[in-house]
Regions:
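Hydrophobic alpha-helical transmembrane segments and their immediately adjacent juxtamembrane loops
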Residues: 236-331
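Peripheral, non-transmembrane regulatory/ligand-interaction domains of membrane transport proteins
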Residues: 1-224, 230-233, 237-240, 244-247, ...
Length: 331
């Protein structure tokens, strides 16, 4: 309702959670005089690159200068930082699903959370927040501030699952093609991209998994009783996805090794055949060379059957070599 008006202030979404799974939008101008009911919570989602966002955060948010500096940092890694007064900073990463972007170029979302207030900042759009808005519009969204950050982490993790499944299916397909066709050559560029993508995802997801483990142990007064169980489940899910990413990297290595072995075997066979052919024709070339030298005359040069005799001699030598190679099991 107020999105266009709020956008000029850098405010992407401003919502008051009603404590029942729904939410109502508010305008940026209502923030200064906003009075929340006991069951309500405020969620402000800002565009970090907007100048008004930085101005509001430092002058009107009530956050410490230390917290503002961290929220506005250019480059961050997933981290969890408890603050005084039962507040916390939570930095997470999500899969980049924006058009033309690489998924492993993960999108950062920075979150300040307190008992009845959540402030989140992003630079690039996040699908996770869009899905969260749909849930709130249907009255099935988070009811409290603690549930809000939990839902956001859950949607971010679900996107990881979709990408990991897609990478595993690509590796499955390459393995099946290699098994079905000995002459199949995998596309090295696409296969290596899987390895690079898995490495890029692991860089941010590994510390994010540790953060979820930390959140299972944090006991803040405004956390719900079962929040720890949900954070633990997210930790287990992300651990499984990281294991699948590592497995995908190893399987890509095995695919490339199998292709290298096939190429090496094919090359060895080719060189072996050339060696056999050379072994057969080398003595024959030696004999024809001897027949061609003009020392004491050319044998059989006066005989009308000389050429035929020379040919029969060469054929006999070739057959003798073939028999010897067969006897030695070289062919």
């Amino acid at each position: 309702m107020f999105e266009e008006e709020n956008a000029q202030w850098g405010l992407v979404h401003a919502l008051v959670l009603d404590g029942k799974g729904g939410a109502r939008s508010i305008a940026r101008t209502e923030l200064d005089d906003l009075q929340l009911q006991p069951q309500e919570s405020l969620w402000l989602h800002w565009d970090r690159s907007h100048p008004q966002t930085q101005t509001w955060l430092r002058k009107s948010s009530g956050l410490s200068e230390f917290a503002c500096d961290l929220l506005l940092e250019e480059n961050t890694r997933p981290r969890l930082l408890p603050l005084p007064d039962a507040e916390l900073l939570l930095f997470l990463r999500g899969i980049n699903l924006n058009p033309g972007a690489e998924p492993e170029d993960m999108v950062s979302v920075r979150i300040f959370a307190a008992a009845n207030r959540v402030i989140s900042l992003r630079l690039r759009p996040l699908r996770a927040t869009d899905e969260l808005l749909v849930q709130l519009a249907d009255g099935k969204g988070p009811k409290t501030a603690s549930e809000l950050i939990l839902y956001m982490a859950q949607y971010l993790t679900n996107k990881v699952q979709d990408l990991v499944t897609g990478l595993s299916e690509i590796v499955d397909s390459e393995e099946e093609k290699l098994d079905a066709d000995e002459r199949y050559t995998p596309e090295h560029g696409s296969v290596l991209q899987i390895r690079r993508r898995a490495a890029g995802l692991k860089r941010f997801l590994a510390p994010q998994r540790d953060i979820f483990a930390q959140l299972t142990r944090i006991k803040l007064a405004w956390f719900c009783d079962d929040d720890a169980d949900y954070w633990n489940e997210l930790h287990n899910s992300l651990t499984r996805y990281l294991e699948e990413l590592e497995l995908a990297r190893e399987r890509v290595g095995l695919v490339l090794e199998a292709e290298d072995r096939r190429l090496s075997l094919r090359m060895n066979r080719t060189m072996y055949r050339f060696g056999i052919i050379t072994g057969i024709f080398l003595p024959m070339s030696f004999l024809t060379g001897l027949l061609g030298i003009n020392v004491g005359g050319i044998p059989f040069s006066e005989s009308p059957y000389g050429f035929m005799i020379a040919c029969l001699l060469l054929v006999s030598v070739a057959l003798g070599q073939w028999w010897l190679f067969r006897r030695l099991r070289w062919v």
